[in-house]
Amino acid sequence: MTGASGNVMDCFKNAFGAVGEICARAPGRVEVLGNHTDYNEGYTLSCAIDKEVYVAAGKSEASGAFELASTHFSQTVKVKTVEQQRENAWVNYPLGVYKVLKDRGYPVGPFKLAIDSSVPLGAGLSSSAALEVATGLALSGLFHFTIEPAELAKVCQKAENSFVGANCGLLDQFSSIFGKKNHVLFIEYRHLEHETIPIADPDLTLAVTISGVSHSLVTSAYNDRRKECFGAAEYFHKRDPKKTALRDVSMEELKAA
């Protein structure tokens, strides 16, 4: 293997002294239109980018432990109990995906995992969602089960919500799974419908610039904004039970409140 896939397989072999049984990848994403609109049952426009997370995986049933390595971190992490890790917090993303899959009855077991990423960390390009999706794809191949793409997105979102502690919507995971080259992705969140729209103009280029400002859903005010949005939705729902999300509230109603 060459490139990023070769890097992650080398990482696996260096960390665990064996060849990874399977390799999976998932792209980061850029948000074109829509911010905090996914969990308010609104609409977004996004696209996948040409930076990806690669995951190599193998079973570790003999030891019963979970072992994780990354090209971005020097330490190989070994855990026997699947619980949130305060140190080496990056392992919470794949461990969370495992836990949600296990809780939902998928036949997953202990694993060894190596990670390589060209998605800049903390740049707001959803490296965490790409890692979750790549982990889910790797585990489905490793343990021989099928999972529908939309269900995988929900599994990854649940992992980030309940295990990592970031109350994200589905924008990031959906974009990583359904994004397509030279297309933007339109997502409607009340019914979870999506459409890939071709970029018709061949001369159109979407440039993404790294600002240098680090971003984290866990430590930022993201969870506070979500709580505030849900509080506002509850306010309007009490006055009109038909309004179940901020999507249902007009600008005039917001201004009047």
Region locations from a protein language model:
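Short, amphipathic alpha-helical segments that act as regulatory/interfacial helices
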Residues: 49, 98, 230-233
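Residues at beta-strand starts and edge strands
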Residues: 51, 109, 113, 203-205
